[in-house]
Structure formats: C-alpha cells, structure tokens
Amino acid sequence: MDNKMRLEFLAKSENEGFARVSVSAFIAQLDPTIEELTDIKTAVSEAVTNAIIHGYECDESKVVIIEASICEDEISITVEDNGIGIENLEEAREPLYTSKPELERSGMGFTVMETFMDSLEVYSEKDKGTKIIMKKKMNT
C-alpha cells in the first residue's frame, strides 16, 4: 500500500461535500485527469448520501466512515455506516429502485457508482449497516 486515509464525520448532509473534497485532495497525488476526479467525486457523493439518507435515515448524530487507499495506480474507497442496513441488496442495486420514493432524486445511487468506478462491492446486514467498496485504476 502506497498511502491511506481515514475520515469520520457526522451524518449531516452538509458533510457530503467535505467528504468529496477530502477524497479528491487525497487522490491528487496520483495526478488524476479531470474526468477521473469528477467520476470519483460523484461516486463518493452518492455513497455518502446513501449512508446519510438510507442508512441512518437522516439521524445526524450517527457517524459515516470513509477510508481511501492507494496501491500503485489504483484507488480503493470504502464508505461505511452502522445504520439500518439493506434488506434486499439485489433489489436495491436495480436502477430506479428506492426505499424513499418521496425523495426527488432517488433510485440511481448504485447505478451511478457502478458507472463511474471500475468495481463496486456492497456488503450489508439488516440493522447492522452497510459497507461500500469502490475501486478505480487511474491514468488508464
């Protein structure tokens, strides 16, 4: 492993931007293209938003954890919550599926993450939380 960071913050929607910028600053050492940077920022934004809205149901007292690591030319980003978990992971990963239909922009989070990253793994257990691991090779 070349480098690693860990960040913990309260599940407040205003911290989503902070998380995105922090990961961007961390990966700057790889000299990413604007497109790579935008892809990663978007994926991080979706993962953090999912943790806040779905995992913790907007309970701002809870904590979201982000870990990012660089190994050669690959970035690995983990976003984790200890929230309610995802009951049906397969269904949740379907485009346009949402557990919150009343929200304006919902149902595309996992699809966006899969589109912008090279790989996406999701681990979740009901009432224990969700861990999302995203990877992307840089400068390809």
Swiss-Prot record:
Keywords: ATP-binding, Kinase, Nucleotide-binding, Serine/threonine-protein kinase, Sporulation, Transferase. Coiled coil: none annotated. SUPFAM superfamilies: ATPase domain of HSP90 chaperone/DNA topoisomerase II/histidine kinase (SSF55874). Its EC number is 2.7.11.1. InterPro entries: Anti-sigma-factor_SerPK, Anti-sigma_F, HATPase_C_sf. Binds to sigma F and blocks its ability to form an RNA polymerase holoenzyme (E-sigma F). Phosphorylates SpoIIAA on a serine residue. This phosphorylation may enable SpoIIAA to act as an anti-anti-sigma factor that counteracts SpoIIAB and thus releases sigma F from inhibition. This is Anti-sigma F factor. It comes from Clostridium perfringens (strain 13 / Type A). The gene is spoIIAB.
